[in-house]
A protein has these predicted regions:
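Conserved structured core elements
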Residues: 49, 85-88, 92, 96
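Acidic low-complexity segments
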Residues: 1-85
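Surface-exposed beta-strand edges and their flanking turn/coil or helix-capping segments
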Residues: 16-20, 124, 166
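Short, contiguous acidic/charged loop-to-helix segments that flank catalytic cores in large enzymes
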Residues: 81-90, 129-133
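Charged, low-complexity, helix-prone segments enriched in Lys/Glu/Asp/Gln
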Residues: 39, 165-166
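Solvent-exposed loop/turn segments at secondary-structure junctions
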Residues: 10-13, 59-65, 73, 89-90, ...
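Hydrophobic/aromatic-rich core segments of domains that either
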Residues: 93-165
Length: 166
C-alpha cells in the first residue's frame, strides 16, 4: 500500500511543548524494585540532566546485547530481569526500561513507536518518488521532559547497538 503524507504549520513544535501528564510519571510501586531503587536514589541526588547521563552509564555498563530473539522475561520484575539478568532485548525492551527508570527518577518520560529509516525510491516519471518503509524499519525510542526544551528524544538502543541506529 501507499499512503500520502502532508505536513505544515507549527503543530509539531507546539505538540513538543505540551506539558507532561500524570501518566508520564506513572510507575507501579514495587513492580521492578531494583530499577525503582536506582531511580529513587537519582531523584534525590541528581538534577534531571544528570539522571539521563546516569542512565546512559548504567545501560552501557550492563553489557546489554541487541537481539530480535531475546530470552523470555519473567512476569515478576521483568525490567529488572532485562537490565540485571538476561541483559538482552531489542528497541522496545530498551525504550520501556529506560522510560520506567526515568519515571522512577522523577523525570517525565514516554515510549514512542514509529519507524527509523526506510529507502527512498526516486520518481519513475509517473510520480514524485516515495519513501519505502517496511516492518524491519519499525523502532521504539523514548522522550523525556526537560525544562526549558520540552519533550526531548532519547534513544537507549543507540547506547546498546549503535549500528542498529546508523
Amino acid at each position: 500500500r501507499r499512503y500520502g503524507l502532508a505536513s505544515g504549520g507549527d503543530a509539531p513544535a507546539a505538540w513538543r511543548r505540551r506539558p507532561p501528564q500524570p501518566a508520564d510519571l506513572a510507575f507501579p510501586a514495587g513492580s521492578n524494585p531494583r530499577l525503582e531503587a536506582i531511580g529513587g536514589e537519582w531523584a534525590t541526588s541528581l538534577p534531571p540532566l544528570a539522571r539521563l547521563e546516569a542512565a546512559r552509564q548504567l545501560f552501557t555498563a550492563q553489557g546489554l546485547r541487541y537481539t530480535l530473539a531475546p530470552a523470555t522475561l519473567p512476569d515478576t520484575a521483568p525490567l529488572d530481569a532485562l537490565l540485571f539478568s538476561t541483559r538482552e532485548g531489542f528497541c522496545e525492551h530498551f525504550a520501556s526500561s529506560f522510560t520506567a527508570l526515568m519515571r522512577a527518577a522523577g523525570v517525565p518520560a514516554r515510549v514512542v513507536i514509529g519507524y527509523q529509516g526506510g529507502e527512498w525510491v526516486p520518481a519513475d516519471g509517473w510520480g514524485s518518488g516515495y519513501l519505502d518503509v517496511r516492518q524491519r524499519d519499525a523502532h521504539a525510542w523514548s522522550e523525556v521532559w526537560l525544562e526549558p526544551n520540552g519533550w526531548v528524544r532519547v534513544d537507549p538502543t543507540a547506547w546498546v547497538a549503535p549500528q542498529r541506529i546508523a
